[in-house]
Amino acid sequence: MPITVKDELPAIARLRQENVFVMPQTRAKTQEIRPMRLAILNLMPNKVETEVQFIRLLANSPLQVNVELLRLDTHRSSSNSEQHLDTFYRYFSEVKNNNYDALIVTGAPLAHLEYQDVAYWDEFTAILDWAEQHVTSTLFSCWAAHAALYHHYKIKRDLKTDKLCGVFTHQCYFEHGALTRGFDDTFLVPHSRYGHVDVNKINACNELVVLAGSEKVGAYLVKNKSGSQVFITGHPEYDADSLKAEYQRDCEKSDNAPKPENYFPDDDATKQPSKTWQSHAFLLFSNWLNYYVYQTTPYDINLVSQDVRTNNYAE
C-alpha cells in the first residue's frame, strides 16, 4: 500500500529512486477508492483446488477484491460438477462487455499439444485480445504464460523430453522493481512443465522485461513494459503437496515418472514435503495487486477500455 507523507519530505526523492510508491498529501486528499474487480479464467481440471490456491493469495492483500470465476463457452470440463460450474462460474460471452481491473489466466494440462491443436485455442486467443482493451493488468500462469507470449509476441516455446519438475532456486534481477519489491536475492518456486521459452528470445523483445529466473528454469517472471501483462512460468500458488499428487498420478501412468527435484525431504517420496515458497507467493501477488492493479487502474472502471492509467511502473 502507498505511504502518505508531506509533499516536501526530503526522503521522497531517494525512495522514488528505489521505485517505492510514496503518495504526497495533496494527492491523498483527493484519492478515490473502490473494490477491485478481478476475474479468474480457470482452465485447470480441478476447479475447486485451483480456486482455493489463487484466492488464498489474493486474500492476503488489504485491498477488497471482488472475484468472478470465468469459464469458456467452447469447452466443457469432464472432471467437474456442472452444478458447481453453473452456480459459481460465468461464461466469457456473458462478461465480454465488462471491464476488469485484473484478470488471472491459469495454466492448463496441455503440455504436449501444439497451440493450434488446442480445442479452445480460438476462444482463448480472443480472450487475450479482449483483455488488452478491457483489463488493466492480466497475469498469465504456466501454460497460459507460454501461450500468451506466443500469441502476443510470437515467442515460441520448446517442448523438452524431460519434464522440469521440482522446487528450484531463482534469482531476482530487479531489486527495486515494483513487482519484485521485497523479494529476497534468491527464492524458491515450484515448476511442473515440459514447455520452455528461451530467455534470449524474451530479451530480444523490446516490449518485455525478465524480472526473475535461473539457469535451470529459464525465465520465471516476465512482464511487458507497462505492467498490463505479467507472465509466471512456475506455480507459486501450489500447495505443499501439489507436486506430490502430480508425481503419484504420473507414477500410475509410467514406471519412469520423474521425481520432483529438491522437494521431498531426503529425496524420500514417502515423506511429507514442506511449503518453502509461500512467502514469495504472497509477496508476488500482493505487489501485483498493489502496483499494477490498484495503483494503476482508473477509479471509473469504464475508462479501462480507454487505457487511462494513473501510474506506469516500467523497470
From Swiss-Prot:
Biased composition (Basic and acidic residues): 249-258
One of the record's GO molecular function terms: homoserine O-acetyltransferase activity
Positions of substrate binding: K163, S192, R249
Annotated site residues (Important for acyl-CoA specificity) in this chain: A111
GO biological process, one term: L-methionine biosynthetic process from homoserine via O-succinyl-L-homoserine and cystathionine
Chief place where the protein resides: cytoplasm
Catalysed reaction equations from the record: L-homoserine + succinyl-CoA = O-succinyl-L-homoserine + CoA
Pathway in which the depicted protein is active: Amino-acid biosynthesis; L-methionine biosynthesis via de novo pathway; O-succinyl-L-homoserine from L-homoserine: step 1/1
Family statement drawn from the similarity comment of this UniProt entry: Belongs to the MetA family.
Protein name: Homoserine O-succinyltransferase
Originating species: Pseudoalteromonas translucida (strain TAC 125)
Gene coding for it: metAS
